[in-house]
């Protein structure tokens, strides 16, 4: 197995050679362009073009893309590939996600179906608030995902990524919080670290939703894990609140999830995970991708603390 080469958008010839070597480009094909496919926080994400077609190329490099000083395990690429394969094997879920076209374990590459350009953050959050049909589809996706009967061995070992995520969700953002709030976050973090429960997307927010003529699609499951379903629901609820939903969004979402065929969930736990997501997006390294004035930010901080203590 050859040592990986860490790519950039400027490496058109190198990328073309690698795609040809993998059989992802025909011998008589060539790349016509390579461009960034968005502001990925974790992975390098490129859009690669050949005559008449395009695809998304993702590489897991040994650091966090947005914060290169933060190390991240490259094995996350294999975990993400497994998630796509598991979902594509489920008839009720496969239409929700882009097709995985190829996996290169040596260079930690995934080649994905190109769903087209994604809207900017403001448009995504507005649509999350106003597109009732898409919201229904997203809830149905979570209900179906969490219903999959899978052994823990269905995913490659993900412990290093789980611990990195745990630190940036439940620990580091609470360094300046009061001791009671930090202690509650720590207890919730232990639930996350257990690795027990159904398969979760792990980062179910508007940046992972792509809207098209045939409905909404779900992307970027690189934070996937086995865990409590309330975590996915709490993350979604937090971002629905940011998009304009009322503070009761966690309760409303839990009820809609069960109406969609999801299993029994703990409403209080959804609220707490929603509070955690709000707090870590306000104080952690992955801030909300929308502009907040001081009044709105202060209101969200107070709401987050209240939800965590619920």
Name what the model sees in each region:
Residues 1-33:
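Juxta-kinase regulatory segment immediately upstream of eukaryotic protein kinase catalytic domains
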Residues 1-11, 147-191, 283:
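Active-site catalytic-loop/activation-segment of kinase and kinase-like phosphoryl-transfer enzymes
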Residues 35-57, 188-231:
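Active-site acidic catalytic loop and adjacent metal/ATP-binding pocket
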Residues 19, 83-87, 112, 257, ...:
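Structural element of the ATP-grasp superfamily
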Residues 82, 230-262, 274-293:
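Active-site activation/catalytic loop segments of kinase-like enzymes and analogous catalytic loops
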Residues 22-30, 91-96, 261-264:
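Short secondary-structure junctions
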